[in-house]
Amino acid sequence: MTKKPTRGKGEGSIYQRADGMWCTSIELTPGLDGKRRRKVICRKLKQDMTDARRKALAQLDKHGDLSTSSVTVEKWMNHWMNDIAPQKIRPKTLAGYKTVVTGYIIPILGKKNLDKLTAQDVRKLHKTIQSTPKDPALRGQRNLPEGTEMLSSTYALLAHNTLSAALKVALREGRIHSNPCDLVDRPVKRVTEQKALDVPQAIQLLQHLAARPDGPLWATYILTGARRGEILGLEADRITDTLDLSWQLQRITDITKAPADWEYRKLPGKSLYLTRPKSRAGWRIIPLVEPLRSILRLQVGNQQDGLVFTRDGKPWDPDRATKEWRNVLIDAGLPDDVVLHGSRHTTVDLLYEAGVPEAIISEIVGPSSRSVTRSYRSRGNTKQLADAMSKMSELLGTIPA
């Protein structure tokens, strides 16, 4: 007696419906909600259905899954954002992704089936974002005021990169067979003017800061080119003959979604943490020279550890520091359109003005769009770095400590 051939796991059955269509169903891995999933293929001719079934099984064997119409872009983006991305992506970066996912990707493409997403849809995402008023109050209005500012290509670029990252995972899992983002040119990030204080203005500011109780905080920004969180998170035990900028203060709303290998320390205050820079290349150690050496020694005093700069004994809120910086500039009689991050650009310009080589500037301030970041990062360059910082101090002249 001839033994009837058996079907392999997941290969499903072949049957003919009442309307004459030949169909087969292939069992797949459970869906994002844990429910059963099947790929159903129907053709008018049995041979066509058999051919389609064979191709589908080959795809299943190759990719481990088959696309179905049950997963929408909205469902996949939420799954990626909540269950996949947090394993690799830092909380602050993830928060930016969440904003663009909920604000743009889902409203524009969310109802599309994931496996039906095309290059044209990605272009639609770009175009829709760049035709959206920057002012939320104007969105949805048909007749916009003349000169209404729209969202820049930078927003479109962030949306493109976020969608592409989520689709790469979908491609790897076999839920789609190509990433449509790869077929479309990425939006070009808009070049914005990077305003900075010039040498006379920097001197004017430092002289003004000498009389302020919080002057050491703002002077440290100008004299180091450090990032906002690096100075707010500076601790006394990381100040010697050098300044160790290997931690930064950040506000993290949901630390439970942090990657397992991410280093952080909780600080007093709601959602405030000390975190490591994105990569070890960002752990900078710069020499202390005058007047910064005296400024910091007076600030630290006999303090052995803990944050150097606090507000009413508590860690600074990063956003509060940004707002207070503007008030400092106004009080000093200086333009208030140089943002706190612009103090980095001021430091870069001062170092250039002092004749410091570009490679040394990059080692002092870290990656900056105002200077070229070299691929190497020497740790044995202490003398050159100290000379560079001294040149900048000489350029600024004698500033009261």
Regions found by a protein language model. Name each.
Residues M1-K4, L249-W283, L292, R311, ...:
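C-terminal secondary-structure termini that scaffold catalytic or DNA-interacting sites
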